[in-house]
UniProtKB/Swiss-Prot annotation:
Pathway: One-carbon metabolism; tetrahydrofolate interconversion; Amino-acid biosynthesis; glycine biosynthesis; glycine from L-serine: step 1/1
Name of the gene encoding the protein in the UniProt record: glyA
Biological process terms in GO annotation: glycine biosynthetic process from serine; tetrahydrofolate interconversion
Keywords: Amino-acid biosynthesis, Cytoplasm, One-carbon metabolism, Pyridoxal phosphate, Transferase
The protein, known as: Serine hydroxymethyltransferase
Keyword Aminoacyl-tRNA synthetase tagged: no
N6-(pyridoxal phosphate)lysine modification, residue list: 228
Reaction(s) catalysed by this chain's protein: (6R)-5,10-methylene-5,6,7,8-tetrahydrofolate + glycine + H2O = (6S)-5,6,7,8-tetrahydrofolate + L-serine
Subcellular location per the Swiss-Prot or TrEMBL entry: Cytoplasm
Assembly and interaction partners: Homodimer.
Gene Ontology CC annotation, any one: cytosol
EC class name: transferase
PROSITE patterns linked: SHMT (PS00096)
Residues annotated as site: Plays an important role in substrate specificity: 227
Amino acid sequence: MNFDNLEREDEQIAHLVQKEKERQENSIELIASENFVSKAVMEAMGSYLTNKYAEGYPSKRYYGGCHVVDEVEDLARERVKKLFGAEHANVQPHSGSQANMAVYFSILEPGDTVLGMDLSHGGHLTHGSPVNFSGRLFNFVSYGVDKETETINYETVRELALKHKPKLIVAGASAYSRIIDFKTLREIADEVGAYLMVDIAHIAGLVATGLHPSPVPYADFVTSTTHKTLRGPRGGLILCKEKFAKALDKNIFPGIQGGPLMHIIAAKAVCFKEALEPSFKTYMEQVVKNAHVLAEALESYGFKLVSNGTDNHLILVDLTNKDITGKDAEILLDSIGITLNKNTVPNETRSPFVTSGVRIGTPAITTRGFKEEEMKEIASIINDAIKEKDGDLEPLKARVKALCAKYPLY
């Protein structure tokens, strides 16, 4: 992209943008929630649409001059409904957290009981963490993973639901590497008369391409971000049954947001169009293949994988047997050009600022073109770095740079 105007107007920011570009180009990005957008998505984000205020919804705006952005939003809504087979879509949420908040406000009252996945077992802040608005406003009861299998025990979820009678059951996760059984969760919700919301922020790309079962036939509400496996701009979206559309829309605007970001909604529309192409399914298939190969390679070096593997795009690694914390592993690997994040593991004994594990994802490196052989090399580099953490890391930096040079960012 051309940054001539930025360089003229603000050298400091232009310099930092260039530095970040170089960091991305010369690093192996393994953060499971990150990806690289297409140039088309980036151009939409930087378009004239950023100038337009458009409170309200298409044909029901509080400002004039919205006829063009109405078409943009309509395109985004229709494309995402087609992508997921949904009855209604709202593409205005600025983030996944705000998408979840809008759903809660649509059907809950403060103090209502909700069943959600424990953050330390792979859930998300907005699924009831006490430090988040969700845990502060509502009475969340947490379910986790089974101590032995490290996967969701649906019978335990059923028992909790029967005991606590939640008004809403929240499914989905930010660090769970296995298939989620939405049909069974729907059955549990029906047993206790609860709504079902599924947060597919991490697996949206897999759901869209049929590589993970879709929650849309079972859930009352489905929320997501657009910037992880969907490979779009940073933002959120909500899908729901038509009967909830009116309540949902008014809880986005005027409920928790004012004007939508029309340049981001345009970029969302572009990413939905890209996701409808056959090439996107090919991409997502490679994401999953890469995750499987990387997981197997890490296991061959003695790394303990939570639930012993992965069905999706991410791997949760328990480093307890490697004599290193998640925090120290993150810092160590960052120093050689591999970016990932420390992460709690089931039955965590350390602080969330230290952790016993790391989370690894393959969407971003797959976008660059990395395939199975590169996964084996990445696993080897990670193993060598942790094994030689107090030694000379320069040869490992060179191996990272060699991989990055083979697959340019853009």
